C-alpha cells in the first residue's frame, strides 16, 4: 500500500526528521490555488541523500565510497531540489523583432539648464534679485522724519490721507533714479550739451580728417574723441549714443607706452593695462590680437630695453617707449602722441605687397609746414619770403593753438555741465511718477518740493548713490582687495628672499669660521708637536718661539732678540743632532780630536820658527779675521760684541780641535789663497803663550774635550766659562725663501750674511760663493755694514757662512725648515 504524505519544505524536513516529502503549512491552506494554476514548483527531497548514507560500521573497500571531510557536509541534510510538475515548465520562445526607427533621444547638456522665461521656475518662488530690487535703497533720516510728522499734521487738518514712511522713501528714490538717468543721457548726447563739433576734427588714431562710406568717423558722447570705425574696431555704429572703451568702463587709465592720458585706448590681454591704438601701430614690436576689433594689444613685452630707455626729445620725459626718426643716421627719439601733438611728419605708406609701413620724421628732417605757420614766419621776418624759424618752434606754436582750442571746448563743456546740475529738477516729471506709483498727485507734489530743497541744501548732490556707481565702487573695492593681497604676497616673497639670502650669508660665514678654526687647530697641533720634539731633544721650553712671545713689558727683548735666538737655537740643534751619533762614532771622534790636538800643538811650535802648514789653515784663517774688524771699529763695539770677542780668544783651542774633524769629512779646497804670516802670528799671540805647556800634559787637555749631556755641550777646562749671548748679533743674516719652482740640490750649502763672531762656521765651494754673492747683493741692495767688511776684506772669499745640516737626514731638514719658518714669523 502506498503511503500518502503531504509534501514538506526543507525546513520542515529538518525539524521533524521526516524522510518523505511534505508541503508547507501555507501550501496546505491553499491546495485549490496550487491545483488550479498548475504552475511548476519545487520541493526538497532528503530520502535520496539518506539512501546514499552508510553507517560507520559498514565494511567497504576504500574505492567504493567517498569520505566527506568538508565542513559543508551539513548542507547535504537539507535535501535536493526537484520539480513537482515538470510538465508545466514553460517553454522558451524566441522571435525576431523589427528594427525601430532611430529617434533623437534627450541627452543632458554639459551646462546646466537655465530658464530664460519671465515666469518663475516654481509656483511661489521669488528670485533673490527680484527681492533685492524691491527693497527701497533710500532710508529716511531725522530731518525726513520731522518733515513727515509736520506734513501729516497738515494732511490731517486738510482731511487728506496721511503719508507713511515707506511711501515717502519710494517716491524719493524714484525722483533720484529719474534725475540720474535723464541727466546722464543729456550729458552723453549732443543736444543735451548743446556744443557743435568742429568740422576739421581728425581721427585720434590715424590723424586723418576724412571719412568714407563704411568707415565713418564716430564721436564718443562722454570724452568727445573722434575715431574711424576701422581705426578703433567698431564693427557697427550704434543708433544712439556711443562710448569708447575707457568711458564705457568708467576708467581713466594711463597709457603704458607714453605719458599722455585719455584718447583712443585699448586694453592689453590681461585687461589691467591700456595702450593708445596709435602707439601700438607705430611701435614695431607691438602687435594687435584681432585687427577687426583692434584689440587686445599684445607683445608689449617684446619691446627691447633700449627702447624703454630712450628719452623723448619733445617732452623730455623717460616714460614709456619712444620711436626714432626714420632717417638712417638720425637717432632722435620721441613719443608717438608727442609727435602728433607737435605736428611732426608721420607717414603711412602702402607697399605693393599690401603691407603698411610707418615713417616718422623728427623736426629737423620733417617737411610738413602749414600755411599759417609760413604766414607767421613771413610776418616775423619783416616781409622776407624765406622762413628762418626752426621746426621745433613751429611745432610749439601748433601745440599752443591746439591747447587753446581744447581749453575753449573744455570751458564750454564745464559751463554746460554746471548748468545741467543746477537745473536737475527739470529732468523729473511729477505726473509720471504719480501714475507709476499710484500715489495722489498732491502728495507727490509735496514730496517733490521737499526733494528740491534737500538737493539744493546738499549742493545739488544726489541723496543716494547711483546703483551703477555703487556697483562700480564694490567692484573697485574688490579689485583693491585683490591688489592689496597681491602686494602682500609680493612683499612676503621679497621678505622670504631676504631671509634666504641672510641664511645663506650666515651659513657661508659659519663655514669660513669653521675652516679658520680648523687651520688654527692644525697650526696649534703643529706647534705642540714641535714643542714635544724640542722637549725630547733637551731644549728648554721657555726659550722656544712658542713660549718666547713679545710681552707688553718695556723691559722685554725686541724682535732682533727673537731673530738671534732662532738662529742660535738652529746652530745648537745642529750640534745636538751631531751629538746623537753612536757610541763607537763618538769614541773614534774623540781619538781623532786628540790626534789633531797633538798636531796643532806641534804646528804652534813650528809657527814660532816661521814655518806654515796647510793643516792649520782653517784655524789661522778664522782667528785672523777678528783683528781687522776690531781695529776698524775700535771701542764702539756693543756689550755683546765685547763678550763675543773675549770668548773668541778663549775658545781658539777648542776651535782648533774641531777644524781638523771637519776637514776629514770634506775635502780641502786648494783654490783659496794662503793667509799672510803676519796675521798668523798675531792670531797665535792672541791665543796665549801657554799652549806648549798644554801639549806636555795630554791628560789635562783630554779633560777639556767636549762631553755631550743631552743637547748642550759642556766643556770642562781651566778657562772661565762663557755664557750664552742674550743680545742679538749685529747683522745676524737673513733667510731667503725659495720660489715655487726652485729646487734645492742635495748637498748644497745654505748661506747667510757674514758674521765673524759666530760659532759653527764652515766653508763652502767657490760655485756656492758665487751664487750666494748675487743673492746677498740683491737682498742687501748695496748696503754693507761695518761689522761685515773691513778695509782689508774686499774679496768674497773672506766671507764666512753657516754650514747647513746634512741633506741626507730627513729629520735635520724638517727641523731646519721649521726653525727658518719660525724665525720669519718672529720677524
Curated annotation (Swiss-Prot):
Zn finger intervals (PHD-type): 200-250, 310-366
A GO BP annotation: regulation of transcription by RNA polymerase II
Segments of skewed composition (Basic and acidic residues): 646-661, 669-682
Cellular compartments annotated: Nucleus; Chromosome; Cytoplasm; Cytoplasm, Cytoskeleton, Cilium basal body
ZnF endpoints (C2HC pre-PHD-type): 252-286
Broad class of the protein's primary localization: nucleus
Annotated region described as Disordered, given as residue ranges: 1-35, 622-705, 769-810
Key words of the record: Activator, Apoptosis, Cell projection, Chromosome, Cytoplasm, Cytoskeleton, Metal-binding, Nucleus, Repeat, Transcription, Transcription regulation, Zinc, Zinc-finger
GO terms assigned for molecular function: zinc ion binding
Ranges of biased composition (kind: Polar residues): 16-30, 692-705
Family: Belongs to the JADE family.
Purpose: Scaffold subunit of some HBO1 complexes, which have a histone H4 acetyltransferase activity. Plays a key role in HBO1 complex by directing KAT7/HBO1 specificity towards histone H4 acetylation (H4K5ac, H4K8ac and H4K12ac), regulating DNA replication initiation, regulating DNA replication initiation.
This protein's name: Protein Jade-1
Gene: jade1
Amino acid at each position: 500500500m502506498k503511503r500518502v504524505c503531504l509534501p514538506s519544505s526543507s525546513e520542515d524536513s529538518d525539524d521533524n526528521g521526516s524522510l518523505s516529502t511534505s508541503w508547507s503549512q501555507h501550501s496546505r491552506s491553499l491546495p485549490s490555488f496550487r491545483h488550479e494554476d498548475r504552475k511548476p514548483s519545487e520541493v526538497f527531497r532528503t530520502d535520496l541523500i539518506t539512501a546514499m548514507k552508510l553507517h560507520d560500521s559498514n565494511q567497504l573497500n576504500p574505492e567504493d565510497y567517498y569520505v566527506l571531510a568538508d565542513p559543508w557536509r551539513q548542507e547535504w541534510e537539507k535535501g535536493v531540489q526537484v520539480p513537482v510538475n515538470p510538465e508545466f515548465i514553460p517553454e522558451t520562445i524566441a522571435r525576431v523583432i523589427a528594427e525601430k526607427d532611430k529617434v533623437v533621444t534627450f541627452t543632458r547638456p554639459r551646462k546646466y539648464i537655465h530658464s530664460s522665461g519671465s515666469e518663475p521656475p516654481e509656483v511661489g518662488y521669488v528670485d533673490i534679485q527680484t527681492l533685492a530690487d524691491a527693497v527701497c535703497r533710500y532710508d529716511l533720516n531725522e530731518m525726513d522724519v520731522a518733515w513727515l510728522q509736520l506734513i501729516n499734521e497738515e494732511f490731517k487738518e486738510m482731511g487728506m490721507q496721511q503719508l507713511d514712511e515707506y511711501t515717502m522713501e519710494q517716491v524719493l528714490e524714484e525722483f533720484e533714479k529719474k534725475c540720474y538717468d535723464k541727466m546722464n543721457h543729456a550729458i552723453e548726447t549732443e543736444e543735451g550739451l548743446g556744443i557743435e563739433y568742429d568740422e576739421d576734427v581728425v581721427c585720434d588714431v590715424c590723424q586723418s580728417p576724412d571719412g568714407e562710406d563704411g568707415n565713418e568717423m564716430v564721436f564718443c558722447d562722454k570724452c568727445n574723441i573722434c575715431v574711424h570705425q576701422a581705426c578703433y574696431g567698431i564693427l557697427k555704429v550704434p543708433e544712439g549714443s556711443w562710448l569708447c572703451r575707457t568711458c564705457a568702463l568708467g576708467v581713466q587709465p594711463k597709457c603704458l607706452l607714453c605719458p599722455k592720458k585719455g584718447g583712443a585706448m585699448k586694453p592689453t590681454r590681461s585687461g589691467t593695462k591700456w595702450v593708445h591704438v596709435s602707439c601700438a601701430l607705430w611701435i614695431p614690436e607691438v602687435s594687435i590680437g584681432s585687427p577687426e576689433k583692434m584689440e587686445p594689444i599684445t607683445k608689449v613685452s617684446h619691446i627691447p630695453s633700449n627702447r624703454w630707455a630712450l628719452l623723448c626729445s619733445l617732452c623730455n620725459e623717460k616714460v614709456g617707449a619712444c620711436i626714432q626718426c626714420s632717417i638712417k643716421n638720425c637717432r632722435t627719439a620721441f613719443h608717438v602722441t608727442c609727435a602728433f601733438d607737435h605736428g611732426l611728419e608721420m607717414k603711412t605708406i602702402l607697399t605693393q605687397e599690401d603691407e603698411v609701413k610707418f615713417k616718422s620724421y623728427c623736426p629737423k628732417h620733417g617737411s610738413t609746414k602749414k600755411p599759417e605757420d609760413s604766414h607767421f614766419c613771413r610776418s616775423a621776418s619783416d616781409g622776407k619770403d624765406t622762413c628762418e624759424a626752426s621746426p621745433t618752434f613751429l611745432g610749439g606754436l601748433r601745440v599752443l593753438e591746439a591747447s587753446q582750442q581744447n581749453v575753449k571746448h573744455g570751458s564750454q563743456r564745464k559751463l554746460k555741465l554746471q548748468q545741467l546740475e543746477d537745473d536737475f529738477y527739470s529732468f523729473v516729471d511729477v505726473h509720471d511718477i504719480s501714475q507709476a506709483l499710484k500715489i495722489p498727485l498732491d502728495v507727490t507734489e509735496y514730496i517733490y518740493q521737499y526733494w528740491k530743497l534737500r538737493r539744493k541744501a546738499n549742493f545739488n548732490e544726489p541723496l543716494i548713490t547711483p546703483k551703477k556707481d555703487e556697483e562700480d565702487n564694490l567692484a573697485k573695492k574688490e579689485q583693491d582687495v585683490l591688489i592689496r593681497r597681491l602686494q602682500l604676497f609680493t612683499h612676503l616673497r621679497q621678505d622670504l628672499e631676504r631671509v634666504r639670502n641672510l641664511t645663506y650669508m650666515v651659513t657661508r660665514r659659519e663655514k669660513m669660521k669653521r675652516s679658520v678654526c680648523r687651520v688654527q687647530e692644525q697650526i696649534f697641533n703643529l706647534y705642540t708637536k714641535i714643542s714635544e720634539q724640542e722637549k725630547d731633544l733637551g731644549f728648554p721650553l721657555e726659550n722656544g718661539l712658542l713660549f718666547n712671545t713679545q710681552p707688553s713689558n718695556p723691559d722685554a727683548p725686541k724682535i732682533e732678540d727673537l731673530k738671534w735666538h732662532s738662529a742660535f737655537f738652529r746652530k745648537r740643534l745642529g750640534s745636538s743632532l751631531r751629538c746623537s751619533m753612536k757610541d763607537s762614532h763618538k769614541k773614534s771622534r774623540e781619538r781623532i780630536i786628540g790626534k789633531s790636538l797633538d798636531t796643532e800643538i806641534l804646528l804652534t811650535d813650528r809657527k814660532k820658527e816661521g814655518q806654515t802648514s796647510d793643516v792649520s789653515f782653517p784655524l789661522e784663517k778664522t782667528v785672523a779675521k777678528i783683528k781687522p774688524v776690531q781695529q776698524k771699529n775700535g771701542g764702539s763695539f756693543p756689550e755683546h760684541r765685547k763678550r763675543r770677542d773675549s770668548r773668541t780668544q778663549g775658545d781658539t783651542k777648542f776651535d782648533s780641535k774641531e777644524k781638523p774633524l771637519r776637514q776629514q769629512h770634506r775635502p780641502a779646497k786648494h783654490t783659496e789663497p794662503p793667509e799672510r804670516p803676519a796675521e798668523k802670528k798675531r792670531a797665535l799671540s792672541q791665543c796665549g803663550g801657554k799652549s806648549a805647556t798644554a801639549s806636555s800634559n795630554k791628560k789635562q787637555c783630554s779633560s777639556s774635550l767636549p762631553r755631550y749631556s743631552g743637547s748642550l755641550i759642556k766643556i770642562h777646562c781651566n778657562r772661565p766659562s762663557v755664557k750664552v749671548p742674550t743680545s742679538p748679533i749685529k747683522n745676524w743674516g737673513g733667510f731667503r725663501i725659495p720660489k715655487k719652482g726652485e729646487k734645492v740640490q742635495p748637498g748644497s750649502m745654505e748661506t747667510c750674511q757674514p758674521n765673524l763672531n759666530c760659532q759653527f762656521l764652515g766653508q763652502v765651494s767657490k760655485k756656492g760663493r758665487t751664487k750666494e754673492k748675487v743673492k746677498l747683493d740683491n737682498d742687501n741692495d748695496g748696503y754693507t755694514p761695518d761689522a761685515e767688511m773691513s778695509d782689508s776684506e774686499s774679496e768674497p772669499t773672506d766671507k764666512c757662512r753657516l754650514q747647513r745640516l746634512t741633506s741626507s737626514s730627513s729629520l735635520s731638514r724638517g727641523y731646519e725648515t721649521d726653525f727658518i719658518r719660525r724665525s720669519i714669523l718672529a720677524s
